[in-house]
C-alpha cells in the first residue's frame, strides 16, 4: 500500500487485497461502494493536480482517479507508474459528471477514486504498446506474445475460440456423439504431407509420427461400435507455413456409422448454426447451397469459391464466332474455351497498368493473356473492342453487360486452365476490392469430386482427398479401367473462399480398400505393413461409415475477420514454423542425441 512512508516496489508482493469485482463490471449501481480492483495500467494522463489511469483486466477497462489534494503521496506514486504495471487498487466508485461520460466504455458512467494502491509487479520498457500492436512487426509480437495477448483484440479472439469449442462440445454431446481421444504417437504413413517424427529411445532406430489427422483411428472406433465420435484433435503437418496454415493445428473431427453423405452434411450444418448463434449471435441460413466440383470450376475457377462476390465466370465461347479476333477464333476452332468475368461499374476503376497486374496473375496460372473490354455509351471500347465493331450490342446482351462495366476474358485450348486462370483473377479482385457482402458468412458445399488426380511428376494416380474415401457406387465395377472418370463420395465445406471442412463416406470393405491401394501405386507388401491393421479390422463386421474434419483455427479466423490463423492461436509458430518466444525448434545436446541413438549432420 502506498502512503507517505511506503517504498517503491521492492520485490514480489504476497499480501495484497484481492479483487472484489472485475474492472469491466462496474456500473452506476455500484456508485458509493468501496471496491478492490486487480489488473494492469492501460493508459494514463494528468491534468494539473489530478491524475487518471485506465485499469484493465480481461473483463474490460475502468478509469481510476487520484487527486493530489486528497492524497499527495499516492498522487506522486501514480505519476511514476509505467504502462502495463500490475496493480491492486482500493477505492470508491463515483459517478462521472455528465460531460465526462465515456460512451465508448461499458464502465464509462463511473470512475474509481483510489484510496490505496499496491504495485504487484513493475513493468520494463515495452517493446510495443499493447493498445497499438497492429503497428508492431509480427515476429516482435510473437517474441513477446504474452504482451500481444493482453490486447483487447487478442483477448476477444482467444475468448471466442473458447466459446466456439464449448459450443461444439455442447451440440455434439446433445446429438449423441462421444468425445474420444486418439493416439498422438502413431506409425508414419505414406500419404498426405510430411510427418513430424519422434525417435524412440527404447526402440533404437524406430520412430513415432505425430498424427496429421486421426483418420485411421476414428475409422477403427466405428468398427468398435461407438457409432458417433468426435474430438477436438491436435494435428501436425510438416509443410510450408502460410497465412491459414500452421505446423500444429486443431481439427473438429467427426465420424458416424450407418450414414449417407446427406446425413453427415446435415449434422454439420446444424452444428455450425448452433455454434454461430451461441458464440457470436449470428443466424446462418437453414440450408447451405451445393455445387458439384465441375460446377465450381466452371463458374468460379476454383473448388473453394467465395460466394459473397457476385460476379461469376460466364461462357463466352460465342465470341469466337463473332467479330474478327483471331485468338478467340483459334481457341474455339480447336475445341477450347473462352470465359468472361463482368465487373459491374468498374470500367473507370482500373487503369491499363492495373489490368496488366491482373494479367500477370492469369499468366501465373498458365493462361497466355488476359483480354479486356469496357462497356461505355451503349458500346465497347479499349482492349480488344475494335475486333468486335458492329457486334457490340450482341456481346453486351449475351454477357448482360451494362454501361461502365469492365469485361475480362481468358481463352485457352485447355478448359481447366481457362477457368482456373480467370478464377485466380476473380480471387485477387476479392482480396483487393471492397464490396458490400464482405462481412457476410457464405457457406457452400462442394460435392462429386474426382476420386483420383493424375500426378505427372510420378506418372501415377494420387487420391484427390485420401485413399480411404469411397468411390460413388456407380463406379465400383470400372474403377481400374478409367480412374480419371471416377467420382468419390466426397464433400468439402467452403466458407468465404476457404476450405473449412473436408469429408467423405469411407471404404469399409477389405477388398475395395486393396483395389484403391493398387490404383494409387501402393504395393501389397507396403500396404500390408502400413495399413494392414485397418484392412484386418474391416474383416470383423465393419459398419458403413463417414465423417468430416473442420479446421477449428480457420473457423475462428473467419468468424473474427482475422488475416491469419496465427491471430486466433495463443502461441503460434511464425512463417518459418519457428517460435521467437522460446526459440523453438532448438538444438539437442550430445547426451540427448546419444540416448536416442541419433547423429546429426548439418
Curated annotation (Swiss-Prot):
GO terms for cellular component: cytoplasm. Belongs to the class-II aminoacyl-tRNA synthetase family. Type 1 subfamily. It catalyses: tRNA(Asx) + L-aspartate + ATP = L-aspartyl-tRNA(Asx) + AMP + diphosphate. GO terms for molecular function: aspartate-tRNA ligase activity; aspartate-tRNA(Asn) ligase activity; ATP binding; nucleic acid binding. The record marks 47 as: Important for tRNA non-discrimination. The gene is aspS. Residues 215-218 are annotated as: Aspartate. L-aspartate binds at residues 191, 237, 465, 506. This is Aspartate--tRNA(Asp/Asn) ligase. The keyword Lipid biosynthesis does not apply. CDD domains: AspRS_core, EcAspRS_like_N. GO terms for biological process: aspartyl-tRNA aminoacylation. Its EC number is 6.1.1.23. NCBIfam families: aspS_bact, PRK00476.1. InterPro entries: Aa-tRNA-synt_II (IPR004364), aa-tRNA-synth_II (IPR006195), aa-tRNA-synth_II/BPL/LPL (IPR045864), Asp-tRNA-ligase_1 (IPR004524), Asp-tRNA-ligase_1_N (IPR047089), Asp/Asn-tRNA-synth_IIb (IPR002312), AspRS_core (IPR047090), GAD-like_sf (IPR004115). HAMAP family: Asp_tRNA_synth_type1. It is found in: Cytoplasm. Homodimer. ATP binds at residues 237-239, 246, 499, 551-554.
Amino acid at each position: 500500500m502506498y502512503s507517505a512512508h511506503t517504498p517503491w516496489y521492492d520485490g514480489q508482493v504476497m499480501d495484497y487485497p484481492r479483487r472484489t469485482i472485475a474492472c469491466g463490471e462496474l456500473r452506476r449501481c455500484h456508485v458509493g461502494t468501496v471496491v478492490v480492483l486487480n489488473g494492469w495500467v492501460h493508459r494514463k494522463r494528468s491534468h494539473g493536480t489530478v491524475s487518471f489511469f485506465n485499469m484493465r483486466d480481461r473483463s474490460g477497462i475502468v478509469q481510476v482517479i487520484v487527486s493530489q489534494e486528497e492524497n499527495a503521496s499516492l498522487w506522486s506514486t501514480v505519476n511514476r507508474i509505467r504502462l502495463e504495471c500490475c496493480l491492486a487498487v482500493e477505492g470508491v466508485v463515483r459517478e462521472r459528471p455528465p460531460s465526462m461520460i465515456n460512451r465508448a466504455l461499458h464502465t464509462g458512467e463511473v470512475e474509481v477514486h483510489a484510496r490505496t494502491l499496491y504495485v504487484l509487479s513493475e513493468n520494463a520498457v515495452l517493446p510495443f504498446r499493447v493498445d497499438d500492436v497492429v503497428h508492431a512487426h509480427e515476429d516482435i509480437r510473437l517474441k513477446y506474445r504474452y504482451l500481444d495477448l493482453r490486447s483487447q483484440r487478442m483477448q476477444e479472439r482467444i475468448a471466442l475460440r473458447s466459446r466456439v469449442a464449448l459450443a461444439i462440445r455442447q451440440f455434439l454431446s446433445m446429438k449423441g456423439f462421444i468425445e474420444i481421444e486418439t493416439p498422438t504417437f502413431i506409425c508414419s504413413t505414406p500419404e498426405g504431407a510430411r510427418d513430424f517424427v519422434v525417435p524412440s529411445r527404447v526402440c533404437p532406430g524406430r520412430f513415432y509420427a505425430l498424427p496429421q489427422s486421426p483418420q485411421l483411428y476414428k475409422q477403427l472406433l466405428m468398427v468398435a461400435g461407438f457409432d458417433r465420435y468426435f474430438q477436438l484433435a491436435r494435428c501436425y503437418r510438416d509443410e510450408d507455413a502460410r497465412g491459414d496454415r500452421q505446423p500444429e493445428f486443431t481439427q473438429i473431427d467427426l465420424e458416424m456409422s450407418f450414414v449417407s453423405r446427406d446425413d453427415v452434411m446435415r449434422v454439420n450444418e446444424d452444428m455450425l448454426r448452433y455454434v454461430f448463434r451461441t458464440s457470436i449471435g449470428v443466424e446462418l441460413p437453414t440450408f447451405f447451397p451445393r455445387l458439384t466440383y465441375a460446377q465450381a470450376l466452371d463458374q468460379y475457377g476454383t473448388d473453394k469459391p467465395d460466394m459473397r462476390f457476385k460476379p461469376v465466370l460466364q461462357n463466352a465461347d460465342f465470341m469466337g464466332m463473332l467479330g474478327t479476333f483471331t485468338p478467340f477464333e483459334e481457341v474455339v476452332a480447336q475445341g477450347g474455351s473462352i470465359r468472361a468475368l463482368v465487373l459491374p461499374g468498374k470500367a473507370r476503376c482500373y487503369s491499363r497498368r492495373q489490368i496488366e497486374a491482373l494479367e500477370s496473375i492469369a499468366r501465373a496460372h498458365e493462361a497466355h493473356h488476359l483480354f479486356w473490354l469496357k462497356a461505355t455509351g451503349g458500346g465497347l471500347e479499349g482492349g480488344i473492342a475494335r475486333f468486335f465493331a458492329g457486334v457490340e450490342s450482341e456481346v453486351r446482351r449475351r454477357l448482360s453487360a451494362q454501361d461502365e462495366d469492365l469485361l475480362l476474358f481468358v481463352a485457352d485450348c485447355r478448359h481447366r486452365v481457362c477457368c482456373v486462370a480467370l478464377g485466380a483473377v476473380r480471387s485477387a479482385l476479392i482480396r483487393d476490392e471492397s464490396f458490400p457482402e464482405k462481412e457476410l458468412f457464405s457457406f457452400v458445399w462442394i460435392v462429386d469430386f474426382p476420386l483420383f488426380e493424375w500426378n505427372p511428376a510420378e506418372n501415377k494416380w494420387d487420391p484427390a482427398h485420401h485413399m480411404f474415401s469411397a468411390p460413388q457406387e456407380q463406379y465400383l465395377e470400372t474403377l481400374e479401367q478409367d480412374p480419371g472418370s471416377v467420382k468419390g463420395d466426397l464433400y468439402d465445406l467452403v466458407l468465404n473462399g476457404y476450405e473449412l471442412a473436408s469429408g467423405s463416406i469411407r471404404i469399409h470393405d477389405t477388398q475395395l480398400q486393396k483395389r484403391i491401394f493398387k490404383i494409387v501405386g501402393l504395393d501389397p507388401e507396403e500396404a500390408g505393413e502400413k495399413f494392414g491393421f485397418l484392412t484386418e479390422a474391416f474383416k470383423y463386421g465393419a459398419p458403413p461409415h463417414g465423417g468430416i474434419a473442420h479446421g477449428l483455427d480457420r473457423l475462428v479466423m473467419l468468424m473474427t475477420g482475422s488475416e491469419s490463423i496465427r491471430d486466433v492461436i495463443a502461441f503460434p509458430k511464425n512463417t518459418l514454423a519457428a517460435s521467437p518466444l522460446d526459440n523453438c525448434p532448438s538444438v539437442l545436446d550430445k547426451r540427448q542425441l546419444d540416448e536416442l541413438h541419433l547423429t546429426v549432420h548439418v
